[in-house]
Each structure stands twice: as C-alpha cells, then as structure tokens.
C-alpha cells in the first residue's frame, strides 16, 4: 500500500513538471493562433491586393513639385552614365515615385528598358529617352493616356532646340543645341555631333545624350502633373494620321526621293514626298 502511495506521488509530480515545462509552448502556440486569426490571416488579402494593384494600370501617382521635377532631371542625367538613355529617363520618374508612393514602383525593374539605348540596341531608331518616357507615362496614366502623353513628348523632342537642361556637375562642357526634326536617335545625335564638331562616344556626345534624358524626364513629369490636375489636352496628332503610314515629318532626310507611298483609311492616299515633308 505504501509503495502505491509513493508511486502515485511521483506520477503526480512528473505530471505537474510536464505541465509547467510545456506551459510556455502552449502559450506561444495560442499566441500564434491568435496572431494568425487577427493579423496574420489579414495579410493574405493584403498581399493579394498588392499583387493585383501592381498588375493593373494605371499605378498611383503623386504630383511632382518644381523641385522634384528638377530632381528628376538630375537623376536622369546621372543614371545615363549607368544604363544609358531609356533607363535614365525612366529612372528620373520612377525613383522619385518610389519615395513618394512606394509600391508598386519599388518592385518595378527599371533595368528592363536598358535594351533601348542607341535607338534600340544601337540600331539608331527611336531615341531611347522617348521609350523610357513612354513607359513612365503608361505606368502612371495607363495605356491610352500614356500614349497621348508620349506623343506630346516626342513632338517636344523633335521640334525643340535641345538639350535645355544644364546640370550642376556636368561630365563635359558642351555649347550646342539642335532641333532634330526627328525622333530617331541616328538623326538626332548625328545632327548635333555635326553642329558641335565632335564624334560618337566622345565626352561631349555622352554629356549631350545625358542631358536629353533629363529633358525628357522633366517634360514627362510636367505632362503627368497636368494629367493629374485634369488639365492635360493633346495638342498634336501622331504623323500616322496625316501621312497614312507610320512615319515622321522629315522623310527626305533619310529616304531622299525614294519614300514609300501609301493609300490608307485616314485620307486620300497622298504621296509622302508631297505631303508636308
């Protein structure tokens, strides 16, 4: 009988010790369940919402102050020497929105546009600054309005004496501005180099192109601000509507007299050589 009492006392102590030892585990487990039930589970919809938000355009936008527009130019200028024209222009907009808005801009890989340097992989086609500007405008304003904004930026690029932007710390001194009459990298930089009297990949040419990225980033920010205020109104139509073919406004610079003719749905089937070119 005495042995049975001792045995029962030992079992009771062991049971109490086990309970005390595991009490902390039970508490942690209960706390974990409480967190999951309150905050943890609520994170799932938030994550899904963030994912949905990042995959749907347009993205959130907060207007740039005049100081931030200037900063966009500074960022674009500096980043040209890291990733060239398209990346530089895009980064001028996105880097500021990363600070002002956060996601989804924080997760956006700006390097996706580096291929567009030199008129797309060095082929001398559309200047990469315009591709970067178009991506930024589309992220913020959506595809339709983004394209209209980009069309305005292209018109500004082709018909303005550029570059305008002068950095506080230039990599080289340049003296010339030039109206390209074209969105093409080849014509734009080629005409400017001839006027400046320098060659390709000289410090002067690279500085010029960095400033072009600044000008396009700043112009894009200005137009996005107008859009945010409900005041953006397109002022020009893309040449395709006047020329009945995807085109620019100085075909003879490249084609001479051998310009493709067209007959399309936008007009009378004009000869591009006689159609204001």
Which functions belong to the PLM regions below?
Residues 1-18:
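N-terminal secretory signal peptides
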Residues 13-18, 30-53:
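N-terminal twin-arginine translocation
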Residues 73-83, 115-124, 201-205, 240:
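A short glycine/serine-rich beta->alpha loop
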Residues 84-141:
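Small-residue-enriched, tightly packed secondary-structure blocks
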Residues 92-97, 136-137, 150-225, 232-242, ...:
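Amphipathic alpha-helical interface segments
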